[in-house]
């Protein structure tokens, strides 16, 4: 009986230590974040707001770029869902100074301050590269394939714990998959917009694996100050709201002008 109790106690202790070790290991692993940036390169969007966009982008990156955060830049054009439509900026942590000597608390605090300064400079350098990539000139596209990007985005999210999305576009879909400009009104009602989104989402699902956008924390859309088709914005947002909802995104899309 004593032997049974002894082995039972040892087993519980081992399980407890294993659980603690697992918990420490999991806690020590930092979350990986992704910022997805998209810019409309179609002919329907002029470049008059470039300066304001750049100012807004810098503010956005300063607020949300942090350690263990990668950034991907995508163009919105006729090849939006292409695998090559992604310019990556991976976060590389600066090296820490390793010393075997015992350090005072003050020295440890100083070392940490110096390390944080390195992180800040790393992020600043990356932000400049991202802004440059977003403003890079490309050939103007006659198509605006927007909804198609949910497929590559879903694939990207598999390697991350969370993500945010920022889109600079009038978001007027104009491609072979779906064209908002064929009729007098892009979406005559919100219910119509939702129904079309449901059909389009099913069509997108058939093109690849299951679309999962649940890791996205928030989505921001920045439209031109003076869009050419203001009437589209009455019901069109409901279309994209439904697309993202069906993709398991639990938040809302924040629409704004510069």
Predicted regions and their residues:
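Positively charged n-region of N-terminal signal peptides that target proteins for export
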Residues: 1-4
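Acidic/histidine-rich, surface-exposed loop or edge segments in extracytoplasmic proteins
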Residues: 31-45, 129-135, 219-224
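VWA/integrin I-like adhesion module and closely mimicked acidic/polar interface patches used
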Residues: 172-228
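Bacterial signal peptide processing site
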Residues: 21-23
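C-terminal motif of bacterial Sec signal peptides marking the signal peptidase cleavage site
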Residues: 16-19
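Extended amphipathic alpha-helical interaction segments
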Residues: 134-196
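Von Willebrand factor
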Residues: 31-160, 163-167
């Amino acid at each position: 009986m004593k032997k049974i109790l002894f082995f039972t106690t040892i087993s519980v202790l081992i399980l407890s230590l294993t659980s603690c070790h697992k918990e420490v290991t999991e806690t020590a692993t930092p979350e990986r974040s992704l910022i997805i940036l998209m810019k409309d390169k179609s002919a329907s969007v002029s470049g008059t707001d470039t300066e304001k966009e750049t100012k807004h982008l810098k503010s956005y990156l300063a607020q949300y770029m942090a350690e263990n955060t990668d950034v991907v830049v995508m163009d919105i054009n006729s090849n939006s869902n292409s695998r090559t439509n992604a310019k990556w900026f991976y976060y590389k942590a600066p090296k820490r100074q390793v010393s075997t000597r015992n350090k005072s608390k003050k020295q440890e605090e100083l070392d940490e301050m110096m390390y944080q300064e390195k992180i800040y400079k790393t992020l600043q350098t990356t932000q400049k590269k991202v802004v440059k990539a977003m403003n890079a000139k490309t050939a103007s596209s006659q198509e605006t394939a927007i909804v198609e990007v949910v497929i590559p985005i879903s694939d990207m999210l598999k390697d991350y714990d969370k993500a945010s999305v920022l889109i600079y576009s009038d978001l007027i879909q104009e491609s072979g998959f779906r064209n908002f400009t064929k009729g007098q009104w892009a979406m005559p009602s919100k219910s119509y917009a939702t129904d079309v989104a449901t059909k389009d989402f099913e069509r997108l699902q058939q093109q690849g694996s299951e679309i999962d956008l649940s890791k996205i924390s928030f989505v921001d859309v920045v439209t031109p100050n003076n869009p050419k088709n203001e009437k589209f914005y009455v019901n069109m947002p409901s279309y994209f709201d439904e697309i993202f909802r069906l993709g398991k995104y639990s938040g809302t899309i924040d629409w704004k002008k510069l």
